[in-house]
């Protein structure tokens, strides 16, 4: 798929490594991703914000999920080599949340942060992506979605925590303090 770009925020002796990526249409500087990054950094974690290869190559859509997942696994493996023995937490926004969930078991992630997990295409609840959310097995997943998200909101029983921010659609306009407050205790739980 080609190279990715990684924006790395390091700390000495990190308690964990958060590897997080964007959605299909956004970037790693989205305010919700930055809220998670800041919380992770404050909790003693190193943070790798990943611009996926399709985006680096100029693509607008992620394309084939298998290729996207294989690329993600290579990225995480390279980061693990740089941070040996450090627990990995992975996350993403929208399409990136799907990738993080689908690959969590193979990565052996300590946990997953899923921002705006797109449960189904807008107006098509019969095309559920619940199986991707459940692909994490016993790995804890924290989902943060807007209450008005046209992509749906996962059921509370399908994740360790599902936080719904009222009056927010798929792209958050407010609630970044809620996002930070939601992820902070989970980072403490997943740290070494």
What is the meaning of each model-derived region?
Residues 92-100:
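Gly/Ala-rich beta-loop-alpha elbow adjacent to hydrolase catalytic centers
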Residues 66, 173-189:
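Post-His helix in hydrolase/transferase enzymes
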Residues 1-87, 99:
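Serine-hydrolase catalytic machinery in alpha/beta-hydrolase-like enzymes
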Residues 166-171:
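Histidine-bearing beta->alpha loop at or near hydrolase active sites
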């Amino acid at each position: 798929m080609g190279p990715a770009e990684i924006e790395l925020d390091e700390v000495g002796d990190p308690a964990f490594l958060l590897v997080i990526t964007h959605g299909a249409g956004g970037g790693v500087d989205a305010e919700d991703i930055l809220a998670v990054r800041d919380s992770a950094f404050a909790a003693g974690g190193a943070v790798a914000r990943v611009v996926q290869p399709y985006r680096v190559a100029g693509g607008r859509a992620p394309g084939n999920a298998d290729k996207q997942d294989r690329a993600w696994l290579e990225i995480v493996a390279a980061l693990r080599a740089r941070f040996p023995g450090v627990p990995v937490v992975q996350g993403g926004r929208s399409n990136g949340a799907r990738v993080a969930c689908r690959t969590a078991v193979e990565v052996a992630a300590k946990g997953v942060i899923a921002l705006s997990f797109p449960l189904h295409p807008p107006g098509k609840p019969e095309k559920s992506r619940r199986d991707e959310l459940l692909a994490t097995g016993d790995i804890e997943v924290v989902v943060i979605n807007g209450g008005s998200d046209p992509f749906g909101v996962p059921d509370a029983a399908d994740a360790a925590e599902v936080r719904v921010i009222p009056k927010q659609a798929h792209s958050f306009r407010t609630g970044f303090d809620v996002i930070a407050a939601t992820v902070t205790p989970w980072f403490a739980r997943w740290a070494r």
